[in-house]
């Protein structure tokens, strides 16, 4: 596991975007060789998406031969609802780049058979050859996607009933009306993300500092699902200074010392492996 500590959340977005661009370009995707990218929603990756859009406009990266799989979607929310993850992804990223619509995969929370929808999603990932790079964010309780505390660490894509804390946190997006907040979601499982060749997790803000501490300094624990990625062969966590507030000083010094030995602009994928 590698932890990259940067000064601000803006720096995290820029660093992550540069890394994604480099991974895609180094892969040299083409008509018979697609780069498969797993993507999150939420406020944390917005900076990364904005930077990737700029790189695309500058001709530095193309998404023509990229296939994407999003982490999750609410159940029962219309696709054109402003809080649906379909709307989020098209509004904040996809409509600004050259990705083909048929190469975008987002779970359908309005499917007549939700279990079949989840199983189909897993099959689509397999048919695409597996995910090269899965990007995620975490919540203050260490959940990744909608794999909330207590989730199985070998779980697959499934229907998930959301915890009360999550419902209350999401109420701000629905006029603070709890009756409007979706009670269920479709989500990739921890095991689904673990199958990816590489995982990059973005963590920003002091409110996520304890979750980062649990992910880095303590053992694997299903009550902190992000901790499962200690056991992934190629995990990269990118955080800002605020997110390190619960880490030991020597832990911060250790990872900062490693980063100093790597030129950010020329960092290779192998440079981030254990």
Curated annotation (Swiss-Prot):
Keywords: Carbohydrate metabolism, Cytoplasm, Hydrolase. Gene3D superfamilies: 3.40.50.1360. Its main location: cytoplasm. It is an enzyme of class 3 (hydrolase). GO terms for cellular component: cytoplasm. It catalyses: alpha-D-glucosamine 6-phosphate + H2O = beta-D-fructose 6-phosphate + NH4(+). It is found in: Cytoplasm. Pfam families: Glucosamine_iso (PF01182). Its EC number is 3.5.99.6. Belongs to the glucosamine/galactosamine-6-phosphate isomerase family. HAMAP family: GlcN6P_deamin. Homohexamer. Catalyzes the reversible conversion of alpha-D-glucosamine 6-phosphate (GlcN-6P) into beta-D-fructose 6-phosphate (Fru-6P) and ammonium ion, a regulatory reaction step in de novo uridine diphosphate-N-acetyl-alpha-D-glucosamine (UDP-GlcNAc) biosynthesis via hexosamine pathway. This is Glucosamine-6-phosphate deaminase. It comes from Drosophila pseudoobscura pseudoobscura (Fruit fly). The gene is Gnpda.
């Amino acid at each position: 596991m590698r932890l990259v500590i940067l000064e601000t959340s803006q720096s995290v977005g820029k660093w992550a975007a540069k890394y994604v661009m480099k991974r895609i370009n180094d892969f040299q995707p083409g008509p018979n060789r697609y780069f498969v990218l797993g993507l999150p929603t939420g406020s944390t990756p917005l900076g990364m998406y904005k930077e990737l859009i700029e790189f695309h406009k500058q001709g530095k990266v193309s998404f023509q031969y990229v296939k994407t799989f999003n982490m999750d979607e609410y159940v029962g929310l219309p696709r054109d609802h402003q809080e649906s993850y379909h709307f989020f992804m098209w509004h904040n990223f996809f409509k600004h780049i050259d990705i083909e619509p048929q190469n975008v995969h987002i779970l359908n929370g309005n499917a007549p058979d939700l279990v079949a929808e989840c199983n189909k999603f897993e099959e689509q990932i397999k048919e695409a050859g597996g995910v090269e790079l899965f990007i995620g964010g975490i919540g203050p309780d260490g959940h990744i996607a909608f794999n909330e505390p207590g989730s199985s660490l070998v779980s697959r894509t499934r229907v998930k009933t959301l915890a009360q804390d999550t419902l209350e946190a999401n109420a701000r997006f629905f006029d603070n009306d709890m009756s409007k907040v979706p009670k269920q979601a479709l989500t990739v499982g921890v095991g689904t993300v673990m199958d990816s060749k590489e995982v990059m997790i973005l963590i920003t803000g002091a409110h996520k500092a304890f979750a980062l501490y649990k992910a880095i300094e303590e053992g694997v624990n299903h009550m902190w699902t992000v901790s499962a990625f200690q056991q992934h062969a190629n995990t990269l966590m990118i955080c800002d200074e605020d997110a390190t507030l619960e880490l030991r000083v020597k832990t911060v010094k250790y990872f900062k010392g490693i980063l100093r030995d790597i030129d950010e602009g020329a960092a290779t994928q192998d440079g981030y492996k254990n």
